[in-house]
Amino acid sequence: MILVNGQPVESLDVRDRGLAYGDGVFRTLRAQAGEPLWWRDHIAKLAADCAALLLDAPDETGLLAEVRRVAAAGQGVVKIILTRGLGARGY
C-alpha cells in the first residue's frame, strides 16, 4: 500500500525527492496480532528524524490508524517512508 499525503496511490512519481536523492526518513516496524511493536520508540525516532531534516512529522494518531489497518492481517512488517515530495532538481 502506498499513501501520498494520506491518500492511496498506485505508484510514486519518479521526481519525488525521496526516490531521486534519498531526501526523507524511514522506519521499519514489526507487527504482531495486528499491532506495531515498540510503537512509542518508533514514533519518537520518526519525529526526531523529521525534525533533523526539517520535514513535517505525520499526525501520530492518523499514522497509527494506517499502520494498524495495514497490519490487521496479523503478523508481518510495515515500512513507513516519509519524503520531502516533489521538488526541483539538485541538492
Describe the residue ranges of each PLM region:
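Conserved alpha/beta cores of soluble small-molecule-handling proteins
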Residues: M1-Y91
